[in-house]
UniProtKB/Swiss-Prot annotation:
GO terms for biological process: pyridoxine biosynthetic process. Its EC number is 1.4.3.5. FMN binds at residues 60-65, 75-76, 81-82, 104, 139-140, 184, 194. Catalyzes the oxidation of either pyridoxine 5'-phosphate (PNP) or pyridoxamine 5'-phosphate (PMP) into pyridoxal 5'-phosphate (PLP). Pathway: Cofactor metabolism; pyridoxal 5'-phosphate salvage; pyridoxal 5'-phosphate from pyridoxamine 5'-phosphate: step 1/1; Cofactor metabolism; pyridoxal 5'-phosphate salvage; pyridoxal 5'-phosphate from pyridoxine 5'-phosphate: step 1/1. It comes from the Bacteria. InterPro entries: Pyridox_Oxase (IPR000659), Pyridox_Oxase_CS (IPR019740), Pyridox_Oxase_N (IPR011576), Pyridoxamine_oxidase_dimer_C (IPR019576), Split_barrel_FMN-bd (IPR012349). Homodimer. It catalyses: pyridoxamine 5'-phosphate + O2 + H2O = pyridoxal 5'-phosphate + H2O2 + NH4(+); pyridoxine 5'-phosphate + O2 = pyridoxal 5'-phosphate + H2O2. The keyword Nucleotide-binding does not apply. This is Pyridoxine/pyridoxamine 5'-phosphate oxidase. One of its GO terms (molecular function) is FMN binding. Its cofactor is FMN.
Amino acid sequence: MDLSDIRREYTRGGLRRNDLPDEPLPLFKKWLQQAIDAKIADPTAMTVATVDESGQPFQRIVLLKHFDRDGFIFYTNLGSRKALHLSHNSKISLHFPWHAIERQVHITGEVEKLSSLEVMKYFTSRPKESQIAAWASKQSNRISARQALEGKYLELKQKFAQGKVPVPTFWGGYRVKINSIEFWQGGENRLHDRFIYSHESSHWNIDRLAP
């Protein structure tokens, strides 16, 4: 399979230093809203990268559920591979691939676990089917067949048919405290625009990176 000629030109315009705010969140919010307005599929989907104890990286797609000055939030099974990695190494990387609007955002940081109150508030806002699925899946564990997972789901669906679904003790969330955030805008002739915000003490440094 020859992939060498699969490429396209980027024509949507550049990104200039004078257009950047002093802090990264206003620009992220603007770009995310533009991704939503452009009807990009799953605009809040982000690649989450962690490393195991041997240094082997792993990636998976997770949905961003909230962001503010305190960090970026996502939820997961605390028995999952990503959670195990983060228990040994709190460093993490997030990546938003908004190809349709010729943009990417890359974030590095460290995680902290969310409080039980924050977890409960979000869990109870989920559809009941999703709440039950959280109970049914021992995420990242090997299973014999899909039928085993579906059978467990149906069993729990019957168990929780009446009343509320409690928050599993093995389910939680993380807040990513940002160390850096890079904004990438596609440019003509592969002269892409890249700016990185690096957090130092109480301020952000902004640097242009070569494409």
